[in-house]
């Protein structure tokens, strides 16, 4: 968990000097200033949801943040900014923040493991679709929400989960902002629950629940038991893959292969006419 925090902090600081990073911070400031939480790489302080928006965008914008491979979710870009903002707003210490973050990672990854890859198959970015639930859970834990309010916060997230993969067509910035928007939505949901708003209790498995909406009623291959299987004993947080290269994990094996060929066989790139890469069919659209 500490390694993931350090990884995200470093990436966010690197992003803060980029055009998209400056624009993300400016946007978060435009939405309202405050004293609750810090923006990484600046001296701005914002309401917690706005800080999560800025920091989540900084965390993901360079495509250098970690991935949980099987669930295909960029977990830490959602979890760490939400935990930082919620902990600051709730004046909690680092130990409490880490505990809440681990809870967020465990739930976030399991949401994707119910139907690995199937959000992407339907054009949804699993990171941003599942991310609000993790952020809401983190905030609920740090802000002292009892079970009923926590359930309401998660229920409210069912109406906040969103994220289109259309950015793959033209390289739009929407991918960069997805974890930030997820964090913002989750923290708002937790705050709504604290104010008495209610959310549907069967937000995941209900007839109009999360999985029926996003992978289709009766469609897809889903296993809802994976939401709780091994919870508290089998730590998905330990399965996060940190990136050696700032690009999609799907490309890393080919980069490794190219580097190996260069180092071991001294191949001159000018001698290469073409390269054939064999990939899983699910990776083709990406």
Positions of PLM-derived features:
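N-terminal core-entry segment
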Residues: 1-238, 281-283
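A conserved active-site cap/scaffold subdomain adjacent to cofactor or substrate pockets
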Residues: 230-276
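Transmembrane helical segments that form the transport core of multi-pass membrane transport proteins
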Residues: 274-286
